[in-house]
Curated annotation (Swiss-Prot):
Keywords: Cytoplasm, Hydrolase, Nuclease, Ribosome biogenesis. InterPro entries: RNaseH-like_sf, YqgF, YqgF/RNaseH-like_dom, YqgF/RNaseH-like_dom_sf. One of its GO terms (biological process) is rRNA 5'-end processing. SUPFAM superfamilies: Ribonuclease H-like (SSF53098). It is an enzyme of class 3 (hydrolase). Its EC number is 3.1.-.-. Could be a nuclease involved in processing of the 5'-end of pre-16S rRNA. It is found in: Cytoplasm. It comes from the Bacteria. It comes from Dehalococcoides mccartyi (strain CBDB1). This is Putative pre-16S rRNA nuclease. Belongs to the YqgF nuclease family. GO terms for molecular function: nuclease activity. Pfam families: RuvX (PF03652).
């Protein structure tokens, strides 16, 4: 969640695969809340996974505090659980995946792809493999 853009991603119903959904322009908190509320009403997620921009040294800096403040407002407004995930290197991973898939980074914004990376990390961590040998 940046100051100008918010990437959104969804998982499949089985919570196995995350996919980029949309990129929202972040104009002001009221408009941003309305846009996210519309997505939540449409897709009815159980919870929201929010990328937290933790500093490279592992500390919570001013940008992460801004994200947490807005996320708390979002949670109260939508009455939905928020789970924070470290978003360090998610954009780099998203760009690598887009490049590997042949998508041109100049024409595709990477915010939603980074959101999918963050969500996929959460899904992989919380869902054990379905089939153990």
């Amino acid at each position: 969640m940046g100051d100008k853009w918010i990437g959104a991603a969804l998982s499949d119903p089985l919570r196995i695969l995350a996919s980029p959904l949309v990129i929202l322009r972040r104009d002001d908190d009221t408009k941003t809340l309305e846009n996210i509320e519309s997505l939540v009403k449409t897709h009815q997620p159980d919870l929201l996974i929010i990328g937290l921009p933790i500093s490279l040294n592992g500390t919570i800096g001013p940008q992460a505090e801004k994200v947490k403040s807005f996320s708390e407002l979002l949670s109260r407004h939508l009455n939905i659980e928020i789970i924070y995930r470290d978003e360090r290197f998610s954009t780099d991973e998203a760009r690598r995946k887009m490049n590997d898939s042949g998508k041109n980074n100049k024409t595709v914004r990477d915010d939603a792809a980074a959101a999918a990376v963050i969500l996929q990390d959460y899904l992989d961590e919380t869902n054990p493999p379905c089939c153990q040998p």
